[in-house]
Amino acid sequence: MNRTKIDWCDYTWNPVWGCLTGCEYCYARKLAKRFWKQMYIKELRFQQKIANEPLRKNLAEFKPVFLQSNFNKKFPGKPSKIFVNSMSDIRWWKKHWMKRVLEKIKEYPQHTFLFLTKFPAVYEEYKFPQNCWLGVTFTGSYGEESRLEEFGYARKVRNRNLFFFSLEPFLDNYLFENYLLDIEWVIVGAQTNPYQPPKREWIEEIIKHTRKLEIKLFIKDNVYRAYPDLPVIKEFPANL
């Protein structure tokens, strides 16, 4: 299991690499461009194969591919927060991949498993164990209204799971006040490469709304790089 520099979780677990969404600011694609060859060699060794051309092509092009070597990683003994898909969006996973992942998660109720997607309707397709937190990534931009509606419906379907927003990168001041009523946690972060922090007034607005609604808020370190005098807020929901 990989320790991570992502400050709102302890480990990352990436049984799948690759995404078809095509966000221009995607950090995962940039990481994959640097490290796909190492991952390819690692997976070949695990599979005890000399070559696998479909695997090589998918890794090189950042198309979704299941990695057995990552899936089989040993989980930590101590209860931990594990981000399941930092190198993919589950919208593009094959259903049998997800079913294998969820079956494994059931074996580790002591851990909290966090998912993120830009397509919240995908949460309606599976039965997630209660120790899964289901996150939706928004940038705060206009044009995301339909996905907010999807989120509202998915939240009702999966009402036993904790839902959260990740505003990262936070690129515009589209307010989510009406939708914040349905969630327990908000993460706010800056665009990392190239670095682009959200405007200070946007952060202050999010702080105001989450305080008013008693929602936990986590402001990432990369925001304080631009605004070191902001109050340090790194909260987690009550069951952690």
Locate each region found by the language model.
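Compositionally biased, intrinsically disordered low-complexity regions enriched in proline and serine
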Residues: 26-28, 41, 109, 180, ...
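Conserved AdoMet/S-adenosylmethionine-binding subsite of the radical SAM
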Residues: 58-225
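C-terminal accessory extensions appended to soluble enzyme cores
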Residues: 223-240
